[in-house]
Amino acid sequence: MESQRNILLIGLLFVSFLLWQQWQADKAPKPVATESSVVANATTNHSADVPEADTGVPAAVAATQNLITVKTDQLDVQINPVGGDIVYAALVSHKLEQGKDQPFVLLEQTKDFTYIAQSGLIGRDGIDSSAKGRAIFAASKTEFTLADGQDSLEVPLTYVAENGVTYTKVFVFHRGKFNVNIDYKINNTSAAPLQVQMYGQIKQTIKPSESSMMMPTYRGAAFSTASVRYEKYNFEDMGKNNLNQPTIGGWAAMLQHYFVSAWIPPATDSNTIFSSVSAGGLANIGFRGAVYDVAPGATQEISSQFYVGPKDQKALSALSDTLNLVVDYGFLWWLAVPIHWLLMFYQSFVGNWGVAIILITLTVRGLLFPLTKAQYTSMAKMRNLQPKLQDLKERFGDDRQKMGQAMMELYKKEKVNPMGGCLPILLQMPIFIALYWVLLESFELRHAPFMLWIHDLSVQDPYYILPLLMGVSMFIMQKMQPIAPTMDPMQVKMMQWMPVIFTVFFLWFPSGLVLYWLVGNIVAIIQQKIIYAGLEKKGLN
């Protein structure tokens, strides 16, 4: 009995430590004040717009152009003709606030904050590494819209160099998707060979993550190579060391809570994943592709993909078999993945994420019921042994070795395992932690309502009703479990305070997680009633 209570206390401390540790690990450095260009008129920037190529000259001259607007069923995008950068991206189907029409803006460029996606051609003859500045593309119109019945939308931009070479940059948007194809077509009509190299990078003002101890979230970069499936690269590390990792395939991304932007070059191409931080506090991460030689009279096509949207594991996996890892479940990912799958499965039937969480709770409690029954049976047997254990303590006094041997012989004789009731508690803790990360990381739960006052399962209960009910349920459970007479008085006081401690902790937890714990406690109370009734019939009162 005492060992089980100790394990419960240790479990609480362990969960608290994990949350505190994750919060410390994901804290970003303080933001650096910067001045960036206003979106109303797009401008090219200094040489930081273009990464270092194998050969090439940094860009220098700035220019101003009107933006090109692209609207699909999922995205509202603005493209700067200077370089063809995506300087604004709003997610039409994801709102900034629940119940309001304003879309969530992921990419933007304002006076105080920059978060944009850049791409271009560098190298010896790259149009974006010229000393005159980046290429200024021309478009047939400034507004493009995905029409009804249209599955894809092409936005072609054209640039004719001084030597007569035509460069076409085509953005291809898709219905129902957040990924954009960026295709370059180089028609070398000159008499000299060309050498170019495509790059794609994401530029963001260094900004701390909006997280708390109970809801830690990560804001920063991440990348994948052939040798490293997934690795976070926070802003602080980016400021200390620049990435320069050759790889086949790979990807580079910027992450924040629920959303991601990522460059995904072709999986079979030779690329280099790079990063840098400019003096103005702008963090860059991206890729440089292979160097292409374009002979006179030849045509060369170079492609890549860019994703800007929610952390949708299915959509991300379709682009790269490791991109779905940006949904980071931590060290218990192997347990969180099936929990997420089961959550999605239940929701597809009931159409309510709160009900799906309740069904997961019933599933977990049902699977653990045989162990729970064994736990309470073991506890009852241990209570019946208390007089004999007390007799052993009086007989052997301070001789702990002999008393320990006598206790083990007694347990063996009575067929009692003193640790037999601990397994359900040990199993519940990793399930609790895994579900915590599922509820924290799964974008599907963002703005997902349950019923009554719970309008968003991904945030804390606005009225703290669920945490208080959870505390009451813990108090009832505690009263149903008799306290061993041999238990230390200090431990008794600590256990009496456990419902209060848990309630305080859960005040700031996502309401979906509190719902899971509350329903679990209610089911546990019912199970205890059933088990105790069976034990009384067997005389294990």
Swiss-Prot record:
Keywords: Cell inner membrane, Cell membrane, Chaperone, Membrane, Protein transport, Transmembrane, Transmembrane helix, Transport. InterPro entries: Membr_insert_YidC, Membr_insert_YidC_N, YidC/ALB3/OXA1/COX18, YidC/Oxa/ALB_C, YidC_ALB_C, YidC_periplasmic_sf. It is a multi-pass membrane protein. One of its GO terms (molecular function) is membrane insertase activity. It comes from the Bacteria. The keyword Lipid metabolism does not apply. It holds the Pfam family 60KD_IMP. It is found in: Cell inner membrane. One of its GO terms (biological process) is protein transport. The chain crosses the membrane at residues 6-26, 325-345, 349-369, 420-440, 457-477, 500-520. GO terms for cellular component: plasma membrane. Its main location: membrane. Required for the insertion and/or proper folding and/or complex formation of integral membrane proteins into the membrane. Involved in integration of membrane proteins that insert both dependently and independently of the Sec translocase complex, as well as at least some lipoproteins. Aids folding of multispanning membrane proteins. Belongs to the OXA1/ALB3/YidC family. Type 1 subfamily. HAMAP family: YidC_type1. NCBIfam families: PRK01318.1-1 (NF002351), PRK01318.1-3 (NF002352), yidC_nterm (TIGR03593), yidC_oxa1_cterm (TIGR03592). Interacts with the Sec translocase complex via SecD. Specifically interacts with transmembrane segments of nascent integral membrane proteins during membrane integration. This is Membrane protein insertase YidC.
